[in-house]
């Protein structure tokens, strides 16, 4: 037998019959019509040579292992260029059966029984064979099937379960980034026309593709909830402690999340409620807790000093404790706040002068109901007044007992409460009067401003009229001067005529 020349041998490549127009060394008219952008010579990156390199590489990549299905992701890793054009070329070759035609099996083909499997020898009748020139691989005849196999798919001996059935576990529709080729598991950006999807990372890096801008894409939430990183969570907690419940400032601090995302994430955190309570306590230091209010309403000087010392110690302890262990501060408007706490809070919100005026108004109001309301806040005067009033009715011993009983602690509680309530109401009324006076002053100031502007407008009009009058006077003077000049010229003309001997009669005839 004669030795065969390896260079003369060619490689067989099986393609469908409908793709018989395909040639390795040429570009068919169908390809030119489908990819007109490669043949217009509008760009150096879109030429017939570039298209042929794309096509040949994709087909050769599939020929490396025709038993597996070629994906666009595996091709995209080795090619550089416009992702849209690469995907278009890939889909075109797959449509005409130039790739993936022998692996386009249904998902349940591996479950077929032996009776349903059909094995043929040689090339089927509907397949045409074309040759690839300059190939170093010799022609090999298809192996004969000696014995029937159990399944319709032949796999290598060391193939694992995940390699065979990994495609079945994948979802039917996987979103892939058109630029980097990775899956879009997180929220991604979709083109307004719905032709391109890019991941969030590529969008932030500015990889929009050719002839695309950031305005051409819209954010699509692919996952049920946005993914929070540790840095974003720490920034959220810091913003909540700093700004309280001002979600606008919090969302500005956490620039990657919206207000709704920040609220939802804080609700999900196990210590979010305590954190909000701690933030409210820091932002409203004038609002006191129940124990502090109870101690603050004590009127005795010594007990008041002890209360302040105790409160300062508690504040230092609370500052050292973590935010989650702080007690939430009750608001004034809450229903469980006592009357004395509300009175103390209302009185603390006004100035000393307003509080003094309110106290005087409260005493004046109480004078109409009680005979000695003013002496309640002055123990010495109240005791002396009681002694003078009781003179003649009780003896000296009874007067001494009365003096011992009367004092700061001997005053009726109901009268104290009424005095405190009247003081708070008077403070509120005084504050309202101050606000009303302030509004009235502002109205007077605005009215004065309007009057001043009207006066300025009137002055400008008067000035304009004065200027106009001066201009008219100047024009009148000019006209008078012109009149005098004309009269003088006429007189001179008549004098010249008389000197030349023109008679009066001739003059009249000439004139007629």
Curated annotation (Swiss-Prot):
Its domain of life reads: Eukaryota
Q: Please classify the protein's predominant subcellular localization into one broad category.
A: nucleus
Q: What happens when the gene is disrupted?
A: Plants have an embryo development blocked at the early globular stage.
Q: What does the entry state regarding organ or tissue expression? A: Expressed in roots, stems, leaves and flowers, but not in siliques.
- State whether it acts alone or in a complex, and with which partners, per the record: Homodimers and heterodimers. Interacts with SWI3B, SWI3C, BSH, and the C-terminus of FCA, but not with BRM or SWI3D.
State the PANTHER family in the record.
SWI/SNF COMPLEX-RELATED, SWI_SNF COMPLEX SUBUNIT SWI3A
Stated role: Component of a multiprotein complex equivalent of the SWI/SNF complex, an ATP-dependent chromatin-remodeling complex, which is required for the positive and negative regulation of gene expression of a large number of genes. It changes chromatin structure by altering DNA-histone contacts within a nucleosome, leading eventually to a change in nucleosome position, thus facilitating or repressing binding of gene-specific transcription factors.
Name this polypeptide is given: SWI/SNF complex subunit SWI3A
| Species for this entry | Arabidopsis thaliana (Mouse-ear cress)
Identify the coding gene.
Answer: SWI3A
